Amino acid sequence: MEWHEIENDADLARLNELYGYFEDSFIVRMEYLSGDYVDSDLCGHMEQTNDLRVTFQRLDREPFSIELWFSHTKRISLFFANPQDKRLSDILFAKVCRNDSAFFWTLWEEFDPYNPEHLEGTALIEACGLKWRIAES
């Protein structure tokens, strides 16, 4: 499937509406690639691309699954449910939004990307770039 680069607020609105603000969805996979590596001469290379790819599935077929690709990820703050926590892991609401310097995926409906206080204590992903695609199910 084709990747769609988020370039403006209309692109963000389209993604949020297409995926129903992530209602009744689950994070089913996350893959983090730092870009750093050690070569065969044992020399370390620090590319620091910090790419994070997150795959979601939801209780709907139109579309069923999407993948978000966060480039140059700055922050990941998520809470994962464990069976002993007796909490649900489904997402009731989430959105993608942005400010002048970053893109955000957050569970907080009232999240204001321009308010620095909103960056603390809430579940979110913050990155310099964002693209998405409908994922193969």
What is the predicted function of each stretch?
Residues 1-137:
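Surface-exposed, interaction-prone regions used to assemble/regulate multi-protein complexes
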